[in-house]
């Protein structure tokens, strides 16, 4: 797969992201105006890949302008206003991923110095979410920390720490089942809980990956969000492509990515998901972060073989190589 050809094919997906960027720099899910900072960062990674620096820089500035004095950011904005009064542990640290992707494209050696004080504050605050066994509570509000840790949030915290070249984290894996999903909800139903540990390189067994993938992969369509539901989602499929790729399951990554390309519509934009029993796209939205995820996965697939070339490489592939060498 050639990146220049795919870059042209996916350009409308990138343009859709820019079309949904507000004047203040925030990137909405779609025309309805909701902005999730984590998804905003996902879109920034895609913009960095396309070297859309004006939109990228506006988006980065918006993010840091909305970091509070404690190094936290609201989990959702609507009409440029914060919606909730709690904070999620993995949101603020994720900004280092788009910054690192920009570094790789621009062939720079460090994050912009003007953001260093806030980045330091973000990661200092992150320590307040961590327990004695290295696990992170997923959220906190005025009453204190939540009583639960999530695989998804924790894995992206570890990815963000790696992007900052911090490998000091150490999870006591013997307490995995005890620590995660303490609210009693069975999250093994969700594909993200399967593949995120591989993306974070906490797990790395190729055979186990493909075995678990069978529970979620629908051949010819993509990856289901929830095991028992006939619903493939394009973002989860794209993230699973990344996880498979960095884990060495390259054929699986290529198959999934080729499957989801069929869902690009006549305008070149991807839907959020497809309910294959009813043969309908659901929900009725074309989320920007879904289109960003496709771009990131496609770029990774096209460039991962150039592992000796730092410049222009994909941030997730680059981080997986950093993990292997440390």
Identify the meaning behind each predicted range:
Residues 4-5, 31, 35, 83, ...:
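Structural signature of alpha-solenoid helical repeat scaffolds
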Residues 1-38, 46-74, 120, 127, ...:
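Low-complexity, Ser/Thr/Pro/Gly-enriched N-terminal "stalk/linker" regions
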Residues 51-106, 110-111, 117-130, 258-285:
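Helix-terminus loop motifs that line ligand-binding clefts
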Residues 12, 113-238:
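Extended ligand-binding clefts on enzyme/binding-domain cores
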Residues 1-3, 41-55, 93-111, 155-168, ...:
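Well-ordered alpha-helical scaffold segments within catalytic/enzyme domains
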Residues 7-18, 41-44, 53-64, 93-96, ...:
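Hydrophobic core segments within long, regular secondary-structure runs in both alpha-
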Residues 64-75, 124-128, 175-181, 217-228, ...:
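Short, mixed-charge aromatic SLiMs
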Residues 32, 206-209, 226-236, 242-326:
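CBM-like carbohydrate-recognition segments
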């Amino acid at each position: 797969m050639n990146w220049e050809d795919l870059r042209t094919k996916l350009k409308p997906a990138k343009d859709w992201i820019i079309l949904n960027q507000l004047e203040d720099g925030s990137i909405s899910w779609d025309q309805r105006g909701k902005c999730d900072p984590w998804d905003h960062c996902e879109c920034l990674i895609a913009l960095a890949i396309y070297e859309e620096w004006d939109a990228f820089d506006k988006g980065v500035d918006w993010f840091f302008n909305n970091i509070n004095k404690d190094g936290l950011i609201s989990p959702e904005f609507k009409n440029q206003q914060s919606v909730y009064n709690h904070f999620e542990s993995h949101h603020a640290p994720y900004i280092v991923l788009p910054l690192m992707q920009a570094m790789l494209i621009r062939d720079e050696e460090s994050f912009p110095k003007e953001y260093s004080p806030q980045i330091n504050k973000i990661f200092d605050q992150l320590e307040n979410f961590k327990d004695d066994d290295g696990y992170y509570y997923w959220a906190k509000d005025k009453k204190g920390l939540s009583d639960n840790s999530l695989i998804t949030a924790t894995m992206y915290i570890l990815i963000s720490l790696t992007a900052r070249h911090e490998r000091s984290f150490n999870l006591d894996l013997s307490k995995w089942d005890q620590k995660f999903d303490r609210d009693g909800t069975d999250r093994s139903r969700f594909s993200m809980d399967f593949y995120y540990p591989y993306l974070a390189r906490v797990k790395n067994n190729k055979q186990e990956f493909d075995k678990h993938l069978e529970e979620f992969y629908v051949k010819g369509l993509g990856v289901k969000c929830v095991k028992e539901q006939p619903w493939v989602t394009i973002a989860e499929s794209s993230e699973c492509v990344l996880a498979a790729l960095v884990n060495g399951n390259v054929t699986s990554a290529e198959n999934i990515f080729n499957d989801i390309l069929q869902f690009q519509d006549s305008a070149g934009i991807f839907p959020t998901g497809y309910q294959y029993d009813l043969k309908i796209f659901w929900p009725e939205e074309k989320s920007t972060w879904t289109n960003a995820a496709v771009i990131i996965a496609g770029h990774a697939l096209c460039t991962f073989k150039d592992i000796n070339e730092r410049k222009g490489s994909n941030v997730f592939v680059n981080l997986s190589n950093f993990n292997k060498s440390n």
